[in-house]
Design a protein with these regions (language model features):
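Asp-based, Mg2+/Mn2+-dependent phosphohydrolase catalytic module
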Residues: 1-6, 103-106, 120, 124-227
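Residue-level marker of regulatory loop/turn positions in helix-turn-helix DNA-binding domains and
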Residues: 94, 115, 147
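Conserved phosphate-coupling serine/threonine residues in phosphotransfer and NTP-handling enzymes
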Residues: 13, 116-118
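Residue-level recognition of oxygen-bearing side chains
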Residues: 19-20, 97, 177, 217
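Polytopic alpha-helical membrane proteins, predominantly small-molecule transporters/carriers
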Residues: 89-90, 114-116, 171, 175
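N-terminal helical cap/lid subdomain that shapes the substrate entry/recognition surface
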Residues: 1-96, 103-104, 108
Length: 227
């Protein structure tokens, strides 16, 4: 596997964080419902924040909500998301062996990037706390790509920021969203089994063809499959 760069997801791929996503989504849903969204049509457990926002945008369009009000709601939602993530930094930890693996990958001359749907400041603080920040050439968080994962624009934009092409990189992540993002960009993908939901992290509990126990296993895997 010839590579010039690697794009990593952050949460449950490199770091073990305990962002209370259900609470975050409940707060967002409460805000939306108090501003005219039909009650009971959004779920904090069955829908991602991206899906919730897609439904919100569609409803705003249907309701003819003024752009100024839409912008106010988007800003309020962003505050909820940022607050939930930054609160988690205090208890966040490196997934065992990951920092050493990242150091080894960087020593091989690879360009490394973070592509997360989390807040940029949260990503930076998480990487600093775990000693990995200096190894990354590109860090892209929420709102910093034309579209978030799993849309193809997320990876396509990231590789351009890395000065590479999709053929030069592999995406590494713990969740179906990461896998779908890679598939949508026709990018190679390596899964890691460090997601909190185990096999339920993958659609129909079917993991990707390449699934490592952890990013800690990535350097020897790439060494064994280099060509």
């Amino acid at each position: 596997m010839k590579l010039k760069g690697i794009i990593f997801d952050l949460d449950s791929t490199l770091v073990d964080s305990h962002v209370d996503f259900p609470k975050m989504k409940r707060n967002i849903i409460e805000l939306l419902e108090s501003n005219g969204h039909p009650i009971g049509t959004l779920s904090p457990t069955d829908q991602t924040t991206v899906v919730i926002m897609e439904h919100a945008e569609q409803m705003w369009e249907k309701q003819g909500k003024p752009e100024e009000e839409r912008r106010r709601l988007r800003d309020a939602i962003t505050i909820h998301m940022n607050q939930g993530e930054l609160e988690a930094v205090e208890t966040l930890k490196e997934i065992p062996g990951v920092a050493v693996a990242i150091e080894k990958l960087k020593a091989r001359g690879l360009k490394l990037a973070i592509l997360t749907r989390g807040h940029h400041e949260y990503a930076v603080e998480a990487l600093k706390k775990t000693g990995m920040h200096s190894y990354f050439d590109v860090i892209l968080g929420r709102g910093e790509t034309p579209q978030p994962k799993p849309y193809r624009e997320a990876i396509d934009y990231t590789v351009r920021q890395m000065g590479l092409t999709v053929d030069d990189v592999v995406m590494v992540g713990d969740h179906q969203i990461d896998y779908d993002s890679a598939k949508n960009s026709r990018c190679r993908f390596i899964g890691v089994d460090t997601g909190r939901r185990g096999l339920k992290s993958w659609e129909n509990e079917t993991p990707p063809p390449v699934l490592l126990d952890s990013v800690a296993d990535l350097p020897p895997y790439l060494e064994a499959h280099s060509s």
